């Protein structure tokens, strides 16, 4: 009997092993199929600290990024939006994320997702909430999980955004927006960067605010000065002494600038300048520090260089918005290109890996080029994306109002920002929106061709991220330009306008 029991037990054990092996094989096959059909491309987590860093920047430019793209790269996450005359971008580096992981050996091509989606807001609304709401129900973490589509007939990747607040968790799912548009992202390789101190930032914004709404501004940089003047009225201007630095430092300090000034040093009996004393002497000497961009030689830039911005108020708003937290006042960045650009950039002062820029293209150059047919630059061909239909996103777009801007009626919103011609963003159904520019890592800013409307090939599918165009409607056509003062006697006192 004992022999019979042992035989039965042995047989049962063999069947159990076979069953376990079959189950394990099935699990392995299922896991393999899941990996093949839904492999993880990105898995990154923005923690509470990262949200607190990014929120003020994105909140400041909320009305610009409502129709933007979220660009997932191997080195950062970028929020990007382009118009025909300029662009805005916010670059979130990996160092502000709590966790980041991406599929090794994957394609280096960036993945694009439309920010302007679901019915109850847009993709990044959790970073653009008012401070009061954030304090009442703070965001604890936001997980960006990008996987390959589990549909074998669907080639686009899926983004699952999981936002965890103290009150609970919400999830948004978005398909990649492969479009026929091109995206351009500027790099740190600019022609030069002007580090504005608080005194010059305040003086410039006050001067811009006193100009008529439809006034244009020419911003110029030379070997000796940074100047801003009203277009068509050279007597109405403000200028500062430009002090070129030998090297571009990661962090610009007042003492670095003062060390370059002849005869300026610490007070008697003191080893170094106090911050208060340094700023006072900077203001007395009307000095701003200018750093040559990497790869550029100061003597070979062909100064003076200038950029004509059509909307003084747009430039003023950009300077005000990007004066944020630990970064202090933003920098003015000149780009050297066929169409010279001027950027208001939040960078180089804070220690965190977060960059923001509102960039304006030279209006005079753009006007000269609008009547010409451009050939696409050769260096743009590598970043082409095929157009695919994204009807699910197009349907979701219909919920937005006529203004096409979330929060446009708020006090701090920006109806005229970013568009150099002082425009507002409106949506017109059935119209294609202006194409963006090319995503490239070169030192050269975009060419005008990347911001011109292009005819869609016959039979090509519409893009999902912007089937309805964000058209530019000039809100200052009927206003008359204020007359230029005939002499300096008619102008405001020099202490309000700055020394000429």
Swiss-Prot record:
The protein's name: DNA polymerase processivity factor
Task: Report the gene name.
Answer: UL42
Polar residues biased stretches:
438-449
Q: Which residues constitute the signal peptide according to the record?
A: none
Tell me which GO cellular component terms the UniProt record holds: host cell nucleus
Q: Which GO terms describe its molecular function?
A: DNA binding
Please report the organism this UniProt entry assigns to the protein.
Psittacid herpesvirus 1 (isolate Amazon parrot/-/97-0001/1997) (PsHV-1)
Superkingdom as given in the UniProt entry: Viruses
Indicate whether Cell cycle appears among the record's keywords.
no
> A biological process (GO) annotation for this entry?
DNA replication
The record's family statement is: Belongs to the herpesviridae DNA polymerase processivity factor family.
């Amino acid at each position: 009997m004992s022999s019979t029991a042992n035989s039965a037990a042995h047989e049962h054990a063999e069947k159990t092993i076979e069953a376990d092996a079959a189950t394990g094989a099935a699990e392995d096959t299922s896991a393999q199929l899941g990996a093949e059909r839904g492999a993880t491309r990105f898995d990154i987590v923005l923690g509470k600290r990262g949200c607190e860093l990014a929120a003020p920047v994105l909140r400041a430019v909320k009305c610009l990024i409502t129709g933007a793209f979220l660009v997932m790269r191997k080195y950062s996450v970028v929020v990007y939006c382009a118009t025909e005359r300029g662009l805005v971008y916010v670059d979130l580096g990996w160092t502000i994320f709590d966790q980041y992981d991406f599929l090794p050996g994957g394609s280096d091509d960036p993945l694009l997702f439309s920010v302007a989606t679901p019915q109850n807001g847009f993709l990044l609304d959790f970073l653009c909430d008012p401070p009061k709401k954030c304090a009442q129900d703070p965001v604890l973490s936001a997980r960006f999980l990008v996987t390959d589509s589990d549909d074998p007939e669907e080639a686009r990747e899926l983004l699952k955004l999981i936002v965890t607040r103290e009150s609970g968790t919400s999830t948004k799912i978005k398909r990649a927006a492969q479009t026929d548009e091109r995206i351009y992202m500027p790099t740190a390789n600019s022609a030069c960067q002007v580090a504005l101190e608080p005194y010059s930032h305040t003086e410039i914004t006050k001067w811009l605010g006193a100009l008529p709404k439809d006034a244009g501004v020419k911003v110029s940089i030379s070997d000796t000065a940074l100047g801003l003047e009203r277009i068509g009225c050279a007597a109405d201007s403000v200028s500062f002494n430009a002090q070129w630095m030998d090297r571009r430092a990661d962090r610009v300090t007042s003492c670095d600038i003062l060390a370059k000034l002849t005869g300026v040093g610490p007070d008697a009996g003191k080893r170094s300048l106090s911050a208060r004393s340094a700023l006072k002497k900077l203001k007395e000497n009307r000095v701003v520090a200018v750093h040559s961009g990497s790869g550029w030689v100061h003597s070979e830039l062909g100064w003076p260089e200038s950029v004509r911005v059509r909307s003084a108020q747009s430039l003023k708003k950009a300077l005000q918005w990007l004066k944020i937290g630990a970064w202090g006042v933003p920098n003015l960045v000149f780009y050297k290109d066929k169409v010279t650009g001027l950027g208001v950039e939040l960078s180089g002062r804070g220690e965190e890996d977060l960059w923001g820029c509102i960039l304006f293209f030279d209006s005079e150059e753009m006007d000269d080029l609008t009547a010409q047919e451009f050939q696409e630059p050769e260096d743009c061909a590598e970043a082409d994306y095929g157009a695919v239909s994204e009807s699910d996103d197009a349907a979701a777009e219909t919920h937005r109002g006529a203004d096409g801007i979330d929060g446009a009626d708020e006090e701090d919103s920006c109806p005229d920002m970013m568009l150099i011609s002082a425009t507002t963003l409106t949506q017109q159904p059935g119209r294609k929106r202006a194409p963006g520019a090319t995503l490239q890592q070169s030192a050269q800013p975009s060419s005008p061709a990347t911001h011109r409307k292009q005819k869609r090939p016959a039979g090509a599918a519409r893009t999902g991220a912007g089937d309805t165009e964000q058209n530019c409607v000039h809100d200052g056509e009927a206003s008359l330009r204020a007359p230029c003062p005939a002499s300096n006697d008619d102008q405001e006192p020099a202490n309000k306008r700055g020394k000429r």
